[in-house]
Amino acid sequence: MKLISICALATLLLTTTVGLAQSRKDQKIMQDAQKAKTTLLETSPGLERFFEDSAGYVIFPNVGKGGFIIGGASGNGVVYEDGEPVGMADLKKLNIGLQAGGQAIIEVIFFETDVDLKRFKTEKFQFAAETSAVALKSGIAFNAKYKDGVAVFALPKAGLMADASVGGQKFSYKAF
């Protein structure tokens, strides 16, 4: 009986520790997402209308991309609905082709309607191979439009890479 109690206590402590570690990681990502939103709006004030009018959006504050012939990207982000955080998302991409370098970017995906946001949250959402992000420069977001219910923007943070595609990115979503 004593062994069972010790095992139960050990399991509880391990579960609590893992939960706290994940919670801290999520909190850090949420803080980074808020900073990323500020940076995006400072860089391209035209995004304000997307933040205000979209059904929801996901901000990936630190997407790492890299490759030489074979490349990949990954990042964690926060999903917002009506401006409020509702969950966490992660992004993965693997591709083969002419590419070289490495880059860190901020990526934001806006969902035009509730149906588009729900599709992201309930399916294993991914972009078609030809989809690309609008690389943000001052003023460019004013002319951007939704395509198939989404609008994607990327802001380079560091590094250099000759690839602006987001096609083939796969996402997963976990509600709070």
Feature map (PLM): residue ranges:
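Sec/Tat signal peptide C-region and signal peptidase I cleavage site
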Residues: T17-A21
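Bacterial N-terminal signal peptides
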Residues: C7-T16
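Bacterial N-terminal signal peptides that target proteins for export
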Residues: M1-C7
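Small-residue-enriched, tightly packed secondary-structure blocks
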Residues: Q22-F176
